[in-house]
Each structure stands twice: as structure tokens, then as C-alpha cells.
Curated annotation (Swiss-Prot):
Pfam families: ATG17_like. Keywords: Autophagy, Cytoplasm, Membrane. It comes from the Eukaryota. GO terms for cellular component: Atg1/ULK1 kinase complex; phagophore assembly site; phagophore assembly site membrane. One of its GO terms (biological process) is autophagosome assembly. It is a peripheral membrane protein. Autophagy-specific protein that functions in response to autophagy-inducing signals as a scaffold to recruit other ATG proteins to organize pre-autophagosomal structure (PAS) formation. Modulates the timing and magnitude of the autophagy response, such as the size of the sequestering vesicles. Plays particularly a role in pexophagy and nucleophagy. Residues 1-11, 502-513 have a biased composition (Polar residues). It is found in: Cytoplasm; Preautophagosomal structure membrane. Belongs to the ATG17 family. Residues 1-23, 200-224, 496-539 are annotated as: Disordered. Residues 201-224 have a biased composition (Low complexity). This is Autophagy-related protein 17. It comes from Emericella nidulans (strain FGSC A4 / ATCC 38163 / CBS 112.46 / NRRL 194 / M139).
Length: 557
């Protein structure tokens, strides 16, 4: 709109001059004044524009601060999550490794215990042959010669180790389950966080430009907010300028009416109830108020003061400007309304983005606070429980390995007992065979000696008969004696080398007449054996063959 500043002159044109020159009548000027006054209600939009700019700047400042805080928290959050899941993986690895080692140890224990039980079963099944034991004794198995208290004590020790390991494993499992509950809560919080972020991102995409709406960023960008604030400031500035043009138009209308005959009272009446905030000052963008022309103050200060005189040409020019501007005033008001509508929309977008940043910050802060609480209070307990299990398992693992070695040693001992018994059977059979060979040699020697003896006796007797009458009896004292006799004596065997002797074995037995082989029944050498303390059992051939088969089978394994 254009405006013409009033200048100094005196007087006002006559109504007749208005008719002569075709100027609008007073009623038309008054209608323009009323319309100009009505257009000044746009001041409310200008004031609102000022509020919008202030709110937008505040929203931008808050968004910048909150975005920076969110970025810092997100960095810490990512580090905490990474650390948390690393700890959980390590704790789970400890549990799985311990469980696997424990299962392998139990498997080895079960196998060793099964071997031991099998060996003990064989000891129970192996009955000592009656010829090895005193006559009349109840039958005994090899197991009767074994003291199982060592096995029972070993089983008790292993059971205690297994129970302690199971208890430690149960405590670790309970701790890990609680840890998993914590992780599940964190996942739920992260789901809420992602939903909030997604919603905020969608809002940012709708409100941002086309190039930004296609961004793959998971967070709304703050880069568009300064340009929006700047656009609001430009709108507010332009609205203030438009309002000033409306005020100038109103001022011209007031001046024109006052310079028209009979218009002073009308001007006074119309300007008496101006819209609030119009008179005194005009708002400007970016500040609380800006100074402007004081219409009502100047008009009411001295209503009887003389008007500055105007020439006819000046008056006509003023009226012409008013008529032209009156046609544009409504468009100016519409433009102000359009601009305030646009500003409200932009402010809504800014506010939505600010709220999105705040929502993301609150969600991030909630997750971060939960993780911080977990890391400072409960996480050390989960880690300590894993360390406690490791310490218990290391101790018990050593005990279990020692017990496993003891089980293997016991099994080897009892298995050796079985082999030794089979060897004893073989040894008895061997000794029996040797004794038979000795007896055979003795019998053969006895027979040969007896034959030689009889032969010698007969020869001596023949010599005595044939030559004895011719030889004096004292020529050789042995001439008439029988030949010497050879007798075999049994002597009890002493202890083998390396075997300690008992006191009653210190004196070796001496032979006497009852111990002479010549007085023994050659058909029953065992009677002589019993008198000399060496009884060699007469074992069945089947028993010996079974023992040989078992030993041969073990050597081939």
C-alpha cells in the first residue's frame, strides 16, 4: 500500500469543491475509516506471530540441548549394551564349559565305577577252591579277602564333590536366569525406545523437506529446525511491515475525515474505541514491542487544536491514496492471516520435533538409567556368581580327578587280584607237576639203588662162599660186611629269598628215622608232604584250563 505523509497548510476544502472535483463524500471517507479501523484487528495476528517466534526459538534451543544430551547418552548406552552382552556371553561360556567338563568327568567316573563294580562282581563270583582253605571251612570268594571300606569312603568323597558342584551349578543357573530376566526387561525397554524413535523419525520425515524425508536416519534431524525458525522470523517481520502499512492507511483516513467538513466529530467517535494494543506501540519481530505512531494519543491530546492546513491538491492526493489503498487493505489482512496460518503450521512442526527429541531423550534416559542401575548393583553379583562357580568347580574338579585315579587304581588292584588268583592256580599246577617229576626221579633212583644193592650183596656172598675159606678173617675188616645203603630224607623248604622268616622258621628241621624216604609209601607221596608242612593242592584240570584261558584272553587285549 502507498501512503502520503501530511504536510503543513491551513484550512480545509469546502463541500462544494468536493462535488465540483468528483471527490468522495464524507460518508465514503468515514466508511473507509471504519474499514481501516477494522483491519487493524490484525494486530492480534502480529502479536501471535511474535509469540510464535519466541516459542520457536525456545523449541530450537531445547531441541539442540536435548539432542546433544541424547547423543551423549546413546554413545554411553551403546557401550553399556556391548559390555553387558559381552559379560553375559562370558558368563554363559563359563557355565557351558563347566557343565561340559562336569558331564565329561561324571561320564568318566561312571565308566570307572562300572569297571570297578564289574571287577568286584567277578571277585564275588570267584570261589576259592576248597583245597586252598582249611578242611571244614565255609566256602569263600575272593571278595571275602577284600576290604571295601576304601571303596565306600572314595564313593562318599566323590558324592560330596558332585553335590557341591551341582549346588554351585544350580546357583549359577539361577543367577544366569535372573540375568536373562534383566536382559528381557532391557529388550522391552529397547523396543519401546525403538518405537519412540521410529515415531519421532516419522514425524520428522513428514515435517521435513522432500530430500530429508527419504533419509534413512533413525533419529529426526535437527538441521531443518534453524531454517524453519528463520522462516518464522521472516513471516513475523513481513507481518509487522504489513501492519504498519495498515496503520498508515488508518492514519490517512483519520486525517482525511478530520479535514472534511463535519468529519471531526465522526473521527473522534470512530477512534475512541480502537482495538487493544493498536495505539501506543506496534509489535516487531524478535522483541516485545516496537515504537510506532501514536494515533489516539495525538488525536485525544488536544481535540480542539487546529489542524495543519492542507491545500486542495494535497487533499485530493490524500483522498486518492486512501481510495486506492482501501481496495488493497482487505488483501493485506488476508495475507497476514495466511502468514499466521503458515506460522502456526511451522510452529506445530517445530513443537512436534521438539517433543520427539524430548521423547527420545526420555526413552534413552530410561534405558540408560536401567543399565546404569544394573551395572552398579546387580551385574557385579552375576559376575561374582560365575567366579564362585569357577572356584568351586576348579577345586572339585581336582578332587574328582583324584577320585577317578583312585577308582582306576582300585580296579587295577582288584583286577590284579583276579589275575594273581589265576596265576596261583597255574603255579599250584606247576608245583604239582614238579613234585610228580621229583617223585618219579626218586622212585627210579630208589629202584636202581635197590637193584645195585641186591647185586652187590649177592656178589659179596658169592665171593665169601668161594674164597672165604682161604682168606684169614682179619686180613680186612670189611670183608664180611654188607654194602652201604643209600636213603633219601625230606627237609621242609625255607622261605624264598626276600621273604622275612617268622621266629619258628629260624631253625631248619633235621631229618630222623621217620623222615626217611625208605619208610614212605611210594604210592601216596602226599602223606609225607603233609608231615613236612608243604601241601600242594590237587586241583582239577578244568580249573587250571579256565585260569589259563582267562590269562591268555587278558594278554591278547
Amino acid at each position: 500500500m502507498s501512503a502520503v505523509d501530511s504536510s503543513t497548510s491551513s484550512g480545509h476544502p469546502e463541500r462544494e469543491a468536493q462535488h465540483e472535483t468528483g471527490l468522495p463524500p464524507l460518508e465514503t471517507l468515514i466508511s473507509h475509516l471504519v474499514a481501516a479501523k477494522r483491519s487493524l484487528s490484525a494486530i492480534n495476528h502480529v502479536w501471535r506471530a511474535n509469540e510464535i517466534v519466541t516459542s520457536a526459538r525456545s523449541a530450537l534451543e531445547e531441541s539442540v540441548v536435548v539432542s546433544a544430551r541424547t547423543g551423549f547418552l546413546r554413545s554411553g548406552l551403546n557401550n553399556q549394551l556391548r559390555l553387558l552382552y559381552n559379560v553375559r556371553a562370558e558368563v554363559e561360556e563359563i557355565s557351558l564349559r563347566g557343565r561340559s567338563e562336569f558331564a565329561n568327568a561324571l561320564k568318566s567316573l561312571d565308566a570307572a565305577d562300572a569297571r570297578l563294580k564289574k571287577t568286584l562282581g567277578l571277585l564275588r563270583e570267584t570261589i576259592v577252591h576248597a583245597s586252598f582253605r582249611p578242611e571244614g571251612e565255609e566256602p569263600k570268594s575272593l571278595h571275602d579277602f577284600v576290604d571295601e571300606r576304601g571303596v565306600e569312603e572314595l564313593h562318599s568323597t566323590l558324592k560330596s564333590s558332585i553335590d557341591r558342584t551341582n549346588a554351585a551349578q544350580a546357583d549359577l543357573d539361577a543367577s544366569n536366569n535372573a540375568f536373562d530376566v534383566e536382559l528381557q526387561s532391557i529388550k522391552q525397554a529397547l523396543s519401546t525406545y525403538r518405537a519412540t524413535t521410529k515415531l519421532a523419525s516419522s514425524r520428522g520425515s513428514v515435517s521435513s523437506s522432500g530430500s530429508q524425508s527419504g533419509s534413512s536416519s533413525s533419529l529426526p534431524s535437527i538441521s531443518s529446525m534453524p531454517s524453519m525458525v528463520h522462516s518464522l522470523e521472516m513471516h513475523a517481520q513481513e507481518m509487522a511491515n504489513l501492519l504498519e502499512s495498515l496503520v498508515r492507511h488508518f492514519d490517512l483516513c483519520v486525517t482525511a475525515v478530520k479535514h472534511t467538513e463535519g468529519g471531526g466529530a465522526a473521527a473522534q467517535s470512530i477512534t475512541g474505541d480502537m482495538p487493544a494494543g493498536v495505539m501506543g506501540s506496534h509489535p516487531g519481530p524478535g522483541h516485545g514491542a516496537g515504537t510506532g505512531p501514536t494515533i489516539e494519543g495525538d488525536f485525544n491530546a488536544n481535540p480542539n487544536a487546529p489542524l495543519d492546513p492542507l491545500s486542495a491538491s494535497e487533499y485530493r492526493e490524500m483522498v486518492s491514496v486512501i481510495v486506492n489503498d482501501a481496495a488493497e487493505a482487505e488483501d493485506v489482512v488476508m495475507e497476514i492471516q495466511d502468514r499466521i496460518g503458515e506460522m502456526e503450521s511451522v510452529l506445530e512442526t517445530l513443537t512436534a520435533q521438539r517433543d520427539s527429541f524430548a521423547a527420545i531423550y526420555n526413552a534413552t534416559k530410561e534405558v540408560f538409567s536401567y543399565l546404569s542401575s544394573l551395572a552398579s548393583t546387580r551385574l557385579p553379583g552375576y559376575i561374582a556368581q560365575a567366579h564362585a562357580f569357577t572356584a568351586v568347580w576348579n577345586d572339585e574338579h581336582d578332587r574328582i580327578k583324584g577320585g577317578l585315579a583312585d577308582l582306576s587304581d582300585l580296579n587295577a588292584l582288584y583286577d590284579g587280584f583276579l589275575d594273581a588268583y589265576d596265576g596261583l592256580i597255574i603255579e599250584v599246577a606247576r608245583r604239582r607237576h614238579v613234585r610228580h617229576r621229583v617223585e618219579k626221579i626218586l622212585r627210579d633212583a630208589r629202584n636202581k639203588l635197590d637193584a645195585l644193592y641186591e647185586e652187590d650183596v649177592n656178589a659179596r656172598e658169592t665171593f665169601r662162599v668161594e674164597q672165604g675159606d682161604y682168606l684169614p678173617s682179619d686180613i680186612w675188616p670189611g670183608l664180611s660186611r654188607e654194602p652201604m645203603r643209600v636213603e633219601f630224607h625230606r627237609i621242609s623248604g625255607g622261605p624264598l629269598k626276600g621273604v622275612l622268616q617268622s621266629p619258628d622258621q629260624a631253625q631248619s628241621p633235621q631229618p630222623n628215622e621217620g623222615e626217611q624216604l625208605g619208610h614212605q609209601d611210594p604210592q601216596n607221596p602226599g602223606d609225607a608232604d603233609s608231615r613236612f608242612g608243604e601241601v600242594i593242592p590237587d586241583l582239577p584240570q578244568e580249573l587250571v584250563e579256565q585260569a589259563l584261558a582267562r590269562l591268555k584272553s587278558k594278554r591278547q587285549r
